[in-house]
Amino acid sequence: MSAGRKIVVVDGGLSTQLESMGCDIDGPLWTARALQENPTAIEAAHRAFISAGADVIITGSYQVSRQGFIEAGHAADDADRALGLSVEIARRAAEGTSTVVAASVGPYGAISHDGREYKGNYGLSERQLADFHRERIEFLVAAAPDMLAIETIPDVREAEALAVALEDFAGFPAWITFAAKDEGHVCAGQTIEEAVAVAQSIPGIERVGINCTAPVHVNGLIDRITAATSLPVIVYPNAGGTWDSLSGHWLGVTHEDIVRCAREWRDHGATWIGGCCGTEAEGIGAISEALRAA
């Protein structure tokens, strides 16, 4: 139980919010496309989450990397600029508020735009993965976010590589969240306890948890995480619906469903709570209102 603990509301799915605003983010760069083509929309999306009650916003850098930009036909320095710009935009949106700006560090598989971020097992060495993440983190940290959001990590081996990469950043504050396939395992198959053990070894990690995961698994995952660590727990799972590509909306999810789940996650011990794919600003508003009223 988290009785007496302060609940912090994390924002929702940036891509979901952008799509709800009519933005076209299809293609290999996903939300990174909007960083280049429509930065004002990114800022508006951040502002929408803040207005809805989010205490923490996550930058649009999830899918930004030199490798990904080069493969999409852009220059490497375009990626470097986009990383810094993602933090700058979030800072502008949060100006005049106490909102925490967390710079997104997505998994290696996100550059493929084919779902590999939910599988892991990339066939790369620890050094290759560490180098990939280090060059991104360098530009994000230089832009001075409040912390890093290392998110949607599907494989303990990638977390181990991130531990190596983060040694160069003197314990810069961060959280790490894993993508899970059931109540006990991350997507690549290792146990959540193995993932937590690695998380605790990473310099600067202040909280650990779950994101981009079906909500049905989250209560059990929180229970196992809290049994394995004293680190605070953060969860921002998917909304749990089905994406309808024709309508451009998530189907089968109500705000009542989202609120019910958020209350359960709080009661199981999570203290930072938000949403991921399928949760737009209106859903975060419902979570914020419900958790602050309880």
Language-model segments: residues:
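Domain-level signal for soluble alpha/beta catalytic cores
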Residues: 1-294
